Structures are given as structure tokens and as C-alpha cells.
Amino acid sequence: MRLICHVSDERFAALADVACEFDDGVTVTLLRSAPSGAVYGDLPAGRYRVTLARDGFGAKRSEVVVPADGPAEPAHLRLLSERPAGYVWPKWTTSGGTGSVRVHSPEPYRLTLVRHGAEAEEVRLLGWFDEHGPRATVQVTPDGDYTPSGVGWAQQVAVTAPERAGLHYVHLETESGARFSFPWVVAPAAPTSSIAVLASTNSWLAYNNFGGRSNYINAAELPERPIVHARTDLDRYRTGTSTEHSPPDERYRPLSFERPEPLNQIGIDEHPTDPIRGRQPCHLAAAEWRLLAWMEREGFAHDLYAEAHLHDGTLDLDRYRVLVISTHPEYWSRQMYDAVYAWVHERGGKLMYLGGNGVDCEVEFLDDATLRFRTQDEEPGGPHENRMHRSHRPTSGLLGVVFTHAGEGTAAPYRVVDPEHWAFAGTGFAAGDVFGVESLHERIPGGASGHETDKRAPSSPPSTHLLATGMNPDGGGAEIVHLTAESGGGEVFSVGSITWSACVLVDKGVADVTRNVLRRFAS
């Protein structure tokens, strides 16, 4: 018997016991996949129509070519589980724009558009959806590696973006109560405030493993065979996480935004003051929502944009006084970096960096739907502070701080270094006082300096002034800094910590400092 093909699911996990019907127009052969997901058989050379079915997955028809001579690379046939999923395309727009809602569900479902601001506020009911054909609400995924090209699902309904900008989610609930939610960033058609906030949409993509690849699992390409057991099959677990980012930049296949984001959901019953549950929500959109909710509650009007809006110029920085980036804005294009740098250092812009491990790695927008990550790790002890420095310019030259691995995976409060700085006005803090104790971050609890932290570096501008330091072990505390541009009046305030956003609603010190900086920068 020869290997004909492999069968795997949307995470590239091997599927055993899949019924496979091979039809060449003359004869029909019935085979089943092995525990490894491999399908073996004695098929004559030719082109076959293949029908696949297994309980818990949508049935599908594909094509397989069996060559006459010599070994051939076996096809990878992909099935989609019956868990509901969906996305809006494109995933960002401006007020009045149109989004295509694309949903996969094995049963009828209800869609609601919700704006996640000070609270979760229903914008409108999009309706109940079903189809006349049997299981016509079930989608399929392409065969092979579709992470660079997207899934190409059929549209269920078109939705017009509301006039009020912000972080929106479409919430899906099936007839039996299964749920899924997916983000839609709605920017204003024209500025409505002096404060712009950037959603970290490139990071959302980097962590999206739908299809079996992200920038953290099978980062360069899918392996030759589907995964049976991740910890024994994948180099990430066998030899360490650094394996994912050891190949040269040109080895990494692109990643498409046009896929569902199972790791980036917000629950329909979730409130911004709820603890943030789970590994990924603590640093993706759910954590960013906590900062947006706090800003609205405090009366700081703002306009939300996707990172693509900064890259392509939809976000005109010169129409704003303040730009806020938060939580985990790790992946920027050089166009994004250069635009913000020039705005701060030449035209007086005020940048608030309320996150950690930011602007660490360069990405290239291949088109409106696809990113290529220049993700090869910098050699320890090398001449560059990080990947962005290697491929473009130093992160600390823009933010005043840069991510280092010290303190990674820990969280702690901050200790005040310079209580006389205006960022601490009205707090009553003295040198050595501690703040940033309370946190909603359940993955890494412990304080506002945490998860991943940034510190000053040789490329930090000379004006970079230290205000507070995280109390993380082994010198891993985040450094809060303020710097001023040499000309033009531009300023940067950086906290250097992913967990800051998860603390602002529940920790008075974090809230007071954030409020002081926003008021001063926006005035």
C-alpha cells in the first residue's frame, strides 16, 4: 500500500477513522484514515474525486491526484469541526463602511452586533440565520496550508458599520446555546476627538492559530505530517520555544487575516471589571477593552483604529494630539514606526505606550489581507536590541524602552523612583511607594508590571527619564519613563508592561497616573 493523503482538522491535528470514498469515474474505492491521519491504499494512478466524512466534522469533497511513477508529496485534506466560528471581512473599517459576516455553524444561529466600551452595549440584532439546503450553514476550509491565503468563506449577511466608532464584536449563539464571538474595529470616518487609540490587530493575527499556524506554532510552515501529540511532534516543545523563530526571515510563510480568531473572543456576558480568564485574552482584545472601558468611564473621548489604518494612512496623526498604544503591540511595519517617530520628533505628537513588548518585530503588509513576519530572533549578545532594530530601527529610540526576557512570565507592583514628576501629581506618592497591586490579569496575576516587560537601552533618547520600576524578580521590572523630543514639543510616556491595561480599572495608582498623562497630553 502507498500513502495517498493526510487528513487533519482546522488546527492541523490528525484525524483518524475518516471515511474516504475515492472515485475516478470508473471505480469507487473506500478507505479510512489511520491514527496518524494518513490514508493508505492501492489506488491506480489517476485523478480522484474524494468524499470525506466523520462524525463531529462537516463532510466535504476534494480532489487527489495519484501519480503513475515515483513518490509524490501526499495531499493534505482538511476537515472543519462542527464548533461554530466566524469573522467579519474586512476586520476593520470606518463608520458607514460595510462588513461581510461569514459564519460556520451546523445549526441555526443568532447574530448580535455589540460595542465594547464602558460596558458591552448592543448596537443591533442582525437576525437569525438558517438555510433551505441541508446543513447549508456549514462552511468548508481549503485543503493544504490555507493560513497564508485565508478560508474564503461565503457571506451570510452584510452589515453597515455604526456611526459611533469603537471596538465591536459580532456575537454568535446557536439554537442549542453554543457561542462564538469575533472582533470588528470601527474607526471614525473623520476624527471626533483629540485622542487616537490603536488596536493591536497585528498581534491578534500573530497569535491566531486557526488553520494550524500562527507566529508561535509552526511559524515558518506546516510540518510534513499532521500533529498527533503536540509535545512529542513539535520542535516548540521538544527543543524549546526559540525553535519557532530560529529560521531566517525568508523561511516564514505569510499569515492571512481572513480567518476566524478562536483565541480572541469576548463573552457576551462579560463586563470590563471581570477578571480576564484564559491564556490569550489577557493580552489580546479583551485586555485592550479594559483600557477602552476605563477611558470612556473617565470621560476621555477617543477614536479607535486598527494598526492597518496607521500603516496605510487612514489614521492621520496630524489630526490628533495623542496616540495611545496598549497591552501588546508587538508587530509593526516600518511605515508605522516611521510615521509615529516623525510625528513625535518633528511635529509635536504625544505618544502614550501603555503596554509591553511593543514594536519588537517588523511586519510587511503584502496586501490588505496578509502579513509577512520578519520574525527571526536576534542572536543573544548581538549588536541589535531586538528584531525591529535588526531589520529597521531600535524600538527604544521611539518608546524609550525595549522588551527584554528578564521578568517574563512574572508580575509585580511598581516602586516610585521620582515622585516629583507631574505624572504622579495628586497621588501623594513618595519615593519608594508601591502602586499597581490590583490586577484583572488571571494568567499572570501579581501587579501592573508584568507578563512581558520593557526597560531602557543604549538607544533610548538622552531625555529618557525614569519614573518608576517594577518589582519583578531578577531585575525584570518594567520601567516607566517619560521622554521629550529634541525639537517640536513631542513627548513619549511609556509603562513597558502588558499587564497595565488589566489594572487600570481596579488599581487607583495605575488609574491616577494614566489620568494625569492623558489630561496633560490632550490639553
Language model segments and positions:
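Short, acidic Ser/Thr/Gly-rich low-complexity loop/linker segments typical of extracellular
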Residues: 14-19, 24-43
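Short Pro-Gly-centered beta-turn/loop motif in secreted/extracellular proteins
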Residues: 39-49, 55
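A short, solvent-exposed loop/turn motif at the edges and junctions
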Residues: 51-63
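Aromatic-Pro/Gly-enriched surface loop or interdomain linker
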Residues: 104-133, 178-315
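Helical hinge/lid and interdomain linker segments adjacent to catalytic or ligand-binding clefts
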Residues: 134-149, 154-159, 164, 277-365, ...
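An acidic, glycine-rich "communication" segment
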Residues: 216, 220, 359-476
